[in-house]
Amino acid sequence: LAEVEWKGIIWKAAFGTFSYKELLTILKGYGSMEILSFEKPGHFKGMASIALNTGGTRDLTIYYLEVLGPRRAGLGRKALLELKRIFQGKIFVEDPGEILTDEYSIMESILFWIQMFREGVIDGLDSDLVRLHPGIDEKEMKKLEQTVISRMKVLRHEKSS
């Protein structure tokens, strides 16, 4: 199983195997749309696909992102900004809470992604619960956010009862 350390991050095939050359081709955005797993040891790990866009930069679709280490506050944003700097394209997020097992954690994750979208760190989110896209207005985002927060309050109350 080949892996490449590129820009301080270790990249390898998420499913199947790729040669060293194939991995570099995919990272440059010229390969097929394959899902890669990545890890910056001690900082973050995840899974994403990379595509060359018409402007010559590479867009990233993130399927999973996990911050590593005991102090994680602010590191998700930092990881996303690092990936954005490396690939210089847009970042889309697809089904980010799929691997989480409890609903409260999923809601927390969705709130994080809403905030990252609002700040312009990510350019879109497509999940079972929320869909954020360019052109969505702040009023609609606030409504989505309030729905998530309300659900979290209910879950917190149910857990404490």
Can you describe what each PLM-predicted range is?
Residues 1-71, 81-161:
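Non-catalytic substrate-recognition and accessory regions of acyl/acetyltransferase enzymes
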Residues 77:
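Residues forming the Rossmann-fold NAD(P)(H) cofactor-binding site
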